[in-house]
Amino acid sequence: IGTLYFMFGIWAGLVGTSLSLMIRTELGKPGSLLNDDQLYNVVVTAHGFIMIFFMVMPIMIGGFGNWLVPLMLGAPDMAFPRMNNMSFWLLPPSLTLLLASSAVESGAGTGWTVYPPLSSNLSHAGPSVDLAIFSLHLAGISSILGAINFITTIMNMRWEGLLMERLSLFVWSVFITAILLLLSLPVLAGAITMLLTDRNFNTTFFDPSGGGDPILYQHLFWF
């Protein structure tokens, strides 16, 4: 699975790099190249999501983690190999949803933070933002399952006599990262789910006209 993570991360990295090149050519000279601000915003948004959720996290945590953590603990495999499998296979459909979101209507041109009111159903009436939110949900589930797996593996699968203070710093870094991920990702999930209901079920979590607060989204997102 570690190898699959690497392959997936490299592929997503190539997609992200091509988006990055579009951004650089647009900004590299005066005047407009794409002649469409919405399209540029969509490229920036997709670039942010792809590079974080589909390149950096799968390669740095999924790839290196799966290869090195069991090796450094003296464990035969991760604590939950089948959950590990599921963590990986949630990513391709997630990436597909993200790419679909940029193809539907005029794409999700909200910036990678998906801030309201830019992501409200007034600014983006079509399903593009909803698809992006579903994509984030899948990527988040994958990350949370992976984090649970890493924490359990590091706590329970060490060689006898391999105390926590004798662990390599790489294992510690994965351990701490997984704990922080497990704390913060559900908050982001709550924020984007509230945004989803704002868009589709007439709630007003982030809509000032209904007593909501768009700054609340920023608090939840950046937590």
Curated annotation (Swiss-Prot):
Residues 1-4, 70-88, 154-173 are mitochondrial matrix. InterPro entries: Cyt_c_oxase-like_su1_dom (IPR023616), Cyt_c_oxase-like_su1_sf (IPR036927), Cyt_C_Oxase_1 (IPR000883). Its main location: mitochondrion. Binds 2 heme A groups non-covalently per subunit. Binds a copper B center. Ca(2+) binds at E26, G31. It is found in: Mitochondrion inner membrane. GO terms for biological process: electron transport coupled proton transport; mitochondrial electron transport, cytochrome c to oxygen. Its cofactor is heme; Cu cation. Keywords: Calcium, Copper, Electron transport, Heme, Iron, Membrane, Metal-binding, Mitochondrion, Mitochondrion inner membrane, Respiratory chain, Translocase, Transmembrane, Transmembrane helix, Transport. The chain crosses the membrane at residues 5-27, 47-69, 89-111, 131-153, 174-196. This is Cytochrome c oxidase subunit 1. It comes from Doryteuthis pealeii (Longfin inshore squid).
